[in-house]
Amino acid sequence: MGLEHTFYPAEDRFEPLLEHSEPVNFVPKENAKSYVRQGFASPHQSLMDNLVDSTESTKRSENFVSHIPLTPSHSGQSEKLMSTRTSHSPYISPTMSYTNHSPANLTRNSSFNHQHYSTTLRSPPSMRGRGIDVNSSHYPHISRPRTSSDSQKMYTRAPVDYYYIQENPYFNNIDQDSISDKSLPSTNQSLHHSEEDTESDNDFSESIHPEFDIDVFYKVSNILYDESDLQDPEKRERLEWHSMLSSVLKGDVMQTEKRRLRLTEPDGHSGTYISEVWLGLQAWLHGRLNADQAEVIRKSREGVEPVLREVIDFQIQDEETTKPPLEQVTEILEKVEQCKQFYISSREMEENVPLSASKEFNYKLNALISWSNVMESIQVETLVLQKWVGNDEFDLTMRTPQFNYDGVENTSSFVERIFRQSGLQRTFEQRTLTTLNRIIHQAKQTISENAQAFEEMKLPTYEDKLLPLVRFPIKLLEEALRLRLAYAKKIKGPNFLIVDSMLDDFKIALSVAVRIKREYIKIASPSPGWSLPTNVDEDYDNVLLDSLKFYFKLLTLKLSSGNKNLYFKEIDFLENEWAFLNEHIYWINGGDIHMAGQFSYLSNSLLLNVHRYVESHLNGPTERTAASLTNWYSTLLKNTQIRFRKILRFSETLNSRFENASDFVISEGHLPDLVNRLSTTGHFLAYTANLERDGVFVIADHTLSENPEALKALLFSKDISNLETIQQNCSYVLILCPVHPIVWKGRIEKVDVPDFSVDLKTNRVRIIASNKREHLQAAKSVFQSISGDLVTLAVECRSSITRVYKEFIRLSKLCMRISSTVVDCVSAVREACSGVNCHDLIYHVFSFAAEFGQRILRFLSFDSYWQTKLKRKITSLAVEWISFICDECDLMDRKTFRWGVGALEFLMLMIRGNNILLIDDAMFLKIREKVGKSMAFLLTHFDVLGAKSKVAAKLQRESTEVSSSPRLTSFGDVEEEALSIQLLQKETMLRIDELEIERNNTLLERLAIGHVLDDSVFRNRDFIKLASSFSNITIRWQQGHFVRSGMFGDVYTGVNMETGDLLAVKEIKLQDSRTFRSTVDQIHNEMTVLERLNHPNVVTYYGVEVHREKVYIFMEFCQGGSLADLLAHGRIEDENVLKVYVVQLLEGLAYIHSQHILHRDIKPANILLDHRGMIKYSDFGSALYVSPPTDPEVRYEDIQPELQHLAGTPMYMAPEIILGTKKGDFGAMDIWSLGCVILEMMTGSTPWSEMDNEWAIMYHVAAMHTPSIPQNEKISSLARDFIEQCFERDPEQRPRAVDLLTHPWITDFRKKTIITMPPATITKKTSLSHTITEEKTAQLLAGRHDDSKAETDSLAASYKEESALPVASNVGLRQPNELRIDSINLPPAIVTPDTINYSVD
């Protein structure tokens, strides 16, 4: 045990020990005397806990006996003196007691190390943070400080400074000491510990009282005396006494004894001591004496070895006569565990019972433990899945009733709940299925590692219990795909948005399905003791193939939708889909053949579209001017070239992927010879039992006899796992279709190959290799060396897949048709340009057709018939090209010379070789004539000695005249035609309104059902608000991808599974009981508001679906994002574009106010845009419906206290809302917010953007300040006046939305601009056009409106007379409503401001 020797001052004399010292208080004399007699101080505090950074003035004794090595001093070194003060400070207690720890009783231990010194002087850890005064004693024998009345001297440095002075030598000393004494624990690893580390329990050794190593201070420079001290007899006596003490403690004898004591008990406790402690604890736990407990343990240990023998000889007994296997294993394991309790550790047990250390025992014991753990995990996971699915049979299609708050029975299967709540991808990422996968792999590993032990102990395999778990993901995905296919096939004529959504869904489903199949095959792979079905069910493969087929159907719909955004990206889209499916198609049985055929079909369809595009545009524009013709045909040629090159490149890549065969014709009468040669060269006949009935035989190379899977892969063009080996052996398969029966004398092997169609003519043989061209060429060489002259090559390279080859032939024909059309387009262009000087255009058409024909010729190199036919057509084109140059162009123009040279070179290329022999006489004579004429005019351009160049330069300087022809424009009278169109539109709208009224009435009748909830249940009382709503619906829908997260819930896309319409689904969770009621009130308030609104500029609300823990709100899906997203790219610079948005904002707000609703949170983030750019008000969570007062003299705020509540976003908030003052006319607060939104659209930055927090914004708004409005040079004066009216400080004077609709800034725009809006349907009652009389409309359009209050009141009254019908919400997505704004139509697609087309008279 470490002891502290406390040295106290002498009797009464106190003198300063150091110069510049801070006064230090010492222990009083009376306390010193008592503890000098004892000679010891309290050992319970570590030495470094005595270091205190004290800022109070204390005194130091003159007679203090310092622990200092006797070395000469260095006069004048004040820093060393100061260092001494801190270096010897470990012997200063925090209560002014100076202590010294004897090295004889202190052991150096790495746990108690110098990390305590690495920080500044501080209080002990036991006192830190507990409100204890560090300047008061924490030792019981020191209670009162005492100060000296003698003279004192102060330090010139702070205590921390002196600590840092001695820090470096201190650490160096520690490092040197650690290196010099290798036998002791190293303390270097503690050097870098932080201050926080020193306060942890890990800093101390396992011994009760850690010892302190005093040696680390011997080398610290801490000389506190000088030569004058040696002259003083008393001081010299003390110094000599200390030198003697130091010599004794540092001597060899003392150091040797210290090391010997350390080595005898390195851990501080002996084994006997630990055993006694353990025995005492066991006796105390069992309520016995130590002797009695020792006897009990001794007798119990006698029965340990039989238990171990029982483990070694353990075997499962018959279940009919004994317990189940799991109980038997659990019982024997409990016995072993009981035996282990009789020993302190496994080492003691192995020493006492050597059998427990034997390999046989541990092998059997580990096997039993592994088997038991896996069985228990399987049972737990089975219960979890049964609870999740809802039944014990894992029946995923069983419909179970769910809680429904409207009283209508709502049953759904487990798969439908998966679609509704999380979707496939997130379902397979959940913890339940990941845990299941881990348990299955763990079970397989356990069986593989302990298969022999399980067999010896007759432990039953748990495959029968594990198989339902292994097949669960397969069954889940199979039912999910089947259900998704059933719903998808119900969709009739889906638009491109629905097609995109379904493509994403099926892409995720296919990738997940393939991943699950791969995992199953990996799990089911053979292993010792592991035997599961290696293949998935056939039904799973069938539904996976059906999903792939429907996926291609969706691809076809997308490519044929006519979407302009996809026009030049069709091939890029196909290439991405090809890359995706190429990764997964190997795992879909039959999918590779279907994929090859479908992609070939799609590429041909795109090529056919190019051909139709060329044919439809050959006639040219209606306006026959040089500029219009050049622009028209240049665009046509450019688009055709880009699309055709991409399609042809993709088709070539596709064909090269599946080109793996060649066809040979068998010479007449040599069939038996060929068969004999094949049978004698090691080939074998692969008997399929299917193809032989059709007269088709499969003969394979001898290298495939031991690899039937490779044979199947070659037949079906699949990827081969050992492709390199197949290529090295030049393996191949022959398909023989003889005219007469054959006699096979070689080997016959039965091969299980499914039936497939073979498009092979009789008396032919087809060789099939891999899709590597080198492999096919090598296989052909081997086959031809065997067959010799018995066969003749018919088709050099083709695909063995029938549909791919047919599509390739179709592609060749399409290329031929397009080439012919392009060549013929030259004559069409020349005819369209007759009478117009378009020689440049015609020349470029000739050049394009020539280059196009050359590309097709290279592609058709395999077919001599089509190639010859096309060559003749292109040769005729070359002759026409020369004729055009010689007959129609200016022969004196140098440009004509360049054109003529190019045409002659192209003609020479086309008639080279034997091609000139294929030309008939008439064509050859024409060629000679035209070539001679062209050569004649070419000679006129030859410049001999540069004479013509000089003449041409002179003529160029003299010609300066430029001619131009005026353009005349005439306009016809269209007033009569416009009137007829207007009458037709009115009649159409009346009919549509009648149909809408009838439809809405029918839907209202269908929704008039339900059941009253039991309001005695407390939780149901809050749900009555939601469940009693007529918009509470039940539809089959699927959750899509995540859109964004809001304050009250997350928004996802959704698909109505019955109609295929897209929805926006807001999911609000009701799990927090603290906010349950407020959330329900919030949902009910938003539903109440949305049910009253039905307008094209308000997001459409479809209904709500109430569940026990969540609520789904179905709304219109706005694909264009929010106005805030649009403004993130910058402000709207064009004021006319800005007005298009402002008109929609005003119309929507006017309608909202006419329905007695305040929005109260208008901001860009709450204003959405649909896929056509229409403005939509959304997020009515803060909105408020205000019932109109019965007394016209009563104001809204008098009957609706909620109007006084603070609601909205501070930067868009009106002053009266912050101040709580008068509110003005109904909706005045929304007008201020609308002005802030319009200002943000003008500037691109939020209002009050210069403020750094919301409190500053509220302060400025409350002070009646207005946001900064742009200068007049940025906006027009009318726009500035409009904004200033929105920011009217007095809410009584602030205009309403209907007032702003009559503002000149709006009416002038309406008179000049014709804006169109997409057609849709709405009841006549909600149409804004019928509320304004024709006379009033004419006045507003003509600008002859009266600005008086009566006029605007009349217009507002017309809005207030409207009452929107409730939204029919159980039949899917409704079409956007049509809004007639004073006979002005709104834009069809406002995606971005620069895409808005408007025309100004």
Curated annotation (Swiss-Prot):
Query: What are the entry keywords?
Result: ATP-binding, Kinase, Nucleotide-binding, Serine/threonine-protein kinase, Transferase
Domain Protein kinase: where?
1037-1306
Tell me which residues bind ATP. Answer: 1043-1051, 1066
Q: Which GO terms describe its biological process?
A: p38MAPK cascade; stress-activated MAPK cascade
What are its E.C. numbers? 2.7.11.25
Active-site residue list: 1161 (proton acceptor)
Q: Where is this region: Disordered?
A: 67-99, 176-205
What top-level branch of life does the organism fall under?
Eukaryota
Q: Where is the composition biased (Polar residues)?
A: 72-99, 176-191
Please give one Gene Ontology molecular function term for this protein. MAP kinase kinase kinase activity
Q: Gene Ontology terms, cellular component aspect?
A: cytoplasm; cytosol; Mcs4 RR-MAPKKK complex
Q: Which reaction does it catalyse?
A: L-seryl-[protein] + ATP = O-phospho-L-seryl-[protein] + ADP + H(+); L-threonyl-[protein] + ATP = O-phospho-L-threonyl-[protein] + ADP + H(+)
Q: Name one Pfam family in it.
A: Pkinase
Which family is this protein grouped under?
Answer: Belongs to the protein kinase superfamily. STE Ser/Thr protein kinase family. MAP kinase kinase kinase subfamily.
Q: What does this protein do?
A: Involved in a signal transduction pathway that is activated in under conditions of heat shock, oxidative stress or limited nutrition. Unlike win1, it is not activated by changes in the osmolarity of the extracellular environment. Activates the wis1 MAP kinase kinase by phosphorylation.
PANTHER family xref list: MAP KINASE KINASE KINASE SSK2-RELATED-RELATED, MITOGEN-ACTIVATED PROTEIN KINASE KINASE KINASE 4
Q: What is this protein called?
A: MAP kinase kinase kinase wis4
Organism in which the protein naturally occurs: Schizosaccharomyces pombe (strain 972 / ATCC 24843) (Fission yeast)
